[in-house]
Design a protein with these regions (language model features):
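Structural motif
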Residues: 1, 28-33, 50-52, 144-147
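Histidine-acidic metal/acid-base catalytic patches
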Residues: 4-15, 21, 44-45, 61-80, ...
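Metal-centered catalytic cores of metalloenzymes
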Residues: 21-28
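Active-site-adjacent beta->alpha loops and helix N-cap segments on the catalytic face
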Residues: 30-42
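Short, catalytically relevant binding-site loops at active-site mouths
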Residues: 33-35, 52-55, 82-85
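Active-site core of PLP-dependent enzymes with the aminotransferase class I/II
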Residues: 57-59
Length: 182
């Protein structure tokens, strides 16, 4: 018999199954998947997102693999800000890309503040994200920056910079136009 929490999760999975055909994917945090059997019916519609350091699981390749083992058809949602928050060297992201090659279905792009809230992309983080973002070509990207309407265009430009190719030496050689008056 299911306890109340398990019953709620099962009911959520059932409700999401009803709309699965109408959507490209359903992103779930790893810690929301206590019983993979509830979610297995959704197959490749499930995208399991890596977590930031506040979460109990899904922060590392090993933790994410434990969840994905129970969901053989699920894809991975790589949140670059989350992995950067967990490991600023981005080595963990490279481990994730190696372990889950071919399963990455979506990339989330943003910057986190100290409280792990989504913030606008800044030029400094773009350089760091660019080292990894280029390894997931032809993947849907969700820009998670929380900005006002006037800042959307600049956030899109910064997001595009994350996916520009590196030069022959493997370094970044690009410039970002500064606003007039600076």
């Amino acid at each position: 018999a299911l306890d109340a929490d398990q019953r709620k999760r099962f009911q959520l999975a059932e409700r999401l199954a009803e709309v699965a055909d109408a959507v490209m994917g359903i992103v779930l945090h790893a810690e929301a998947i206590h019983d993979a059997s509830h979610w297995r019916q959704l197959g490749e519609k499930v995208l399991v997102e890596n977590a930031d350091g506040r979460k109990r699981t899904g922060r590392t390749t090993v933790e994410l693999a434990a969840v994905l083992d129970g969901l053989p058809d699920a894809r991975v949602c790589l949140d670059l800000a989350n992995v950067y928050q967990v490991d600023p060297t981005m080595l963990e992201m490279r481990r994730m890309l190696k372990a889950f090659a071919g399963r990455v279905g979506q990339v989330h792009l943003s910057q986190l503040d100290h409280a792990c809230a989504h913030r606008p992309l800044m030029l400094g983080i773009v350089h760091e994200l660019r080292q990894v973002a280029r390894l997931v070509p032809d993947t849907m990207v969700i820009l998670e920056s929380c900005v006002d309407e006037l800042s959307i265009a600049s956030q899109v430009r910064l997001a595009k910079l994350c996916f520009q190719p590196l030069d022959a030496s493997g370094t970044t050689t690009w410039s970002y136009p500064l606003p007039a008056g600076l």
